[in-house]
């Protein structure tokens, strides 16, 4: 089911982009009044703040962030959330970390299942306490081929999946997220 229309993902902030994507957002609102409109908006790295001119045309602000993976300092995430304080709901539209299935080590060893699970635990612990965060979507459900990913861990795959590429093996991060969703379900009952 489609629950939200998205008009973009991490597009550079130019006048042309704003004009085009604001028209897309207005068109989505006009054509389907039953669904909200979103986009993965930009973060101002200097201010560590969600800051995007497109936000005024959206119902929900999306952000992609990879604290603990591309951004090693996890302290950046609570600061980003504190600095932002938008007047609209936010969904974290991408987050995660690579893990080669069955590759083990410590939480500090990138590419291990332990590191990926730790990133998920820290994300959840941080995001669950921020009132304006209304959802999060991990990147991604299962590993997939990606010719640009040539490292020894990735081996031509994007390994951020919660499942292996054959969809048969559930990585530990899958269970971290499952536990969180079960807690949310119990709270709602």
Language-model segments: which ranges?
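Switch/coupling sub-region of P-loop NTPases
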Residues: 48-49
């Amino acid at each position: 089911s489609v629950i939200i229309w998205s008009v973009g993902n991490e597009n550079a902030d130019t006048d042309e982009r704003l004009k085009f994507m604001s028209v897309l957002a207005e068109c989505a609102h006009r054509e389907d009044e039953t669904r909200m409109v979103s986009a993965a908006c930009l973060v101002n790295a200097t201010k560590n703040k969600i800051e995007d001119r497109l936000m005024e045309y959206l119902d929900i602000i999306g952000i992609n962030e990879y604290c603990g993976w591309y951004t090693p300092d996890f302290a950046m995430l609570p600061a980003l959330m504190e600095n932002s304080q938008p007047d609209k709901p936010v969904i974290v539209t991408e987050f995660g970390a690579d893990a080669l299935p069955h590759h083990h080590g410590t939480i500090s060893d990138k590419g291990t299942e332990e590191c990926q699970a730790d990133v998920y635990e820290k994300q959840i612990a941080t995001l669950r306490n921020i009132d304006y965060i209304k959802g999060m979507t991990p990147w991604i459900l299962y590993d997939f081929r990606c010719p640009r990913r040539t490292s020894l861990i990735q081996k031509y795959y994007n390994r951020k999946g919660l499942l292996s590429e054959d969809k048969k093996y559930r990585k530990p991060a899958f269970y971290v997220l499952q536990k969180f969703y079960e807690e949310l379900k119990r709270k709602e009952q």
